[in-house]
Amino acid sequence: MKLLPELKYSKDHEWVKVIDGDVVYIGITDYAQDQLGEILFVETPEVEDTVTKGVDFGVVESSKVASDLISPVNGEVLEVNEKLEDEPECINEDPYENWILKVKLADVAELDTLLSDKEYEAGLE
C-alpha cells in the first residue's frame, strides 16, 4: 500500500493535498481504491457546491460495490476532475495523482485534525 508523507488523511480513506494556502485537492487513498476494485463511475458535486466535513459528497461505484465519498474538510468546490467522467479507472492506476475535487477550505486549521501517513497506516492495522 502506497502512502505519501506530504498528504493528510481521513479515517474514511480520503486524502488531502494542500496546493496553495487554503486550496486543496481531495482524493481517495491507495487502500480505498484497492478495496473497491475496478472503479467504474465517480459521482461528484458541482463547482460552487459546499462540502461538509464528515458528510458524503459523492459516490464511487466499482465492480464490487458503491461507496460514499466522505468529505474530510469543510469548503467550497472550485473544480471537479473532469478526467473521471471518461476515465474513472485512472484512480486505480494512481489514486494520488488523480484527485476528485479541488476545494477552497472554510478553515485551514481543519488540516490539523487530519491524520499523518503514519497515523492513517496505524489505523488500518
Swiss-Prot record:
Protein's UniProt keywords contain Transport: no
The record's listing under InterPro entries reads: Biotin_lipoyl, GCV_H, GCV_H/Fam206, GCV_H_sub, Single_hybrid_motif
Q: Name one GO cellular component term.
A: glycine cleavage complex
* Cofactor binding: number and manner: Binds 1 lipoyl cofactor covalently.
Any idea which UniProt keywords this protein has?
Lipoyl
Recorded protein name is: Glycine cleavage system H protein
Q: Which gene is annotated as encoding this protein in its UniProt record?
A: gcvH
Write out the similarity annotation: Belongs to the GcvH family.
Q: What does this protein do?
A: The glycine cleavage system catalyzes the degradation of glycine. The H protein shuttles the methylamine group of glycine from the P protein to the T protein.
Where the record annotates domain Lipoyl-binding, the positions are 23-104
Gene Ontology terms: biological process: glycine decarboxylation via glycine cleavage system
Task: Spell out which residues are annotated as carrying N6-lipoyllysine.
Answer: 64
Disulfide bridges in this chain = none
Q: How does it assemble?
A: The glycine cleavage system is composed of four proteins: P, T, L and H.
Q: Which cofactor does it need?
A: (R)-lipoate
Which PROSITE patterns does the record associate with it?
Answer: BIOTINYL_LIPOYL
